[in-house]
A protein has these predicted regions:
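Catalytic toxin/effector domains delivered as secreted proteins or via bacterial secretion systems
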Residues: 2, 6-128
């Protein structure tokens, strides 16, 4: 399972993630080294969507990728101070856009997940 970047020092980066299960056919990933960055990969080479869960099995994050394997959409459940100043986790999303011909992306500010999104993606959000 891919690293968070494709190349390092001119070589393919070592895999940082392992598949630990599936939910409705979508891979649930876990870091091989728990000390590394907890963000799911920015690129996907074997799936169009990945899920990450907390150690207790509750939902943490999901990312959806386009046909070029680039990150396009992310849903997360963690603190997001711009949406909730209490410090409590909040279910929110970001949309990613790319400059034509570039691998550079822009991410929108966090927005609360809509009811429509919850209906479509809720089966992946255990415990939220």
């Amino acid at each position: 399972m891919g690293g968070n970047s494709t190349f390092a020092a001119g070589k393919v980066a070592a895999y940082r993630w392992k598949t630990v299960g599936k939910i409705d056919g979508v891979k649930v990933l876990e870091l091989k080294d728990q000390g590394l960055s907890r963000k799911l990969p920015e690129e996907a080479h074997s799936s169009r969507m990945y899920i990450q869960q907390h150690p207790d099995g509750t939902f943490s994050q999901l990312r959806i990728y386009d046909h070029f394997h680039r990150l396009r959409f992310e849903v997360g459940f963690h603190r997001e101070p711009r949406l909730d100043r209490s410090g409590s986790p909040v279910l929110h999303y970001h949309v990613y856009t790319y400059t034509s011909g570039s691998s550079h992306f822009e991410r929108t500010e966090a927005r609360r997940v809509t009811e429509r999104m919850r209906k479509k993606l809720g089966k992946f959000m255990k415990g939220v």
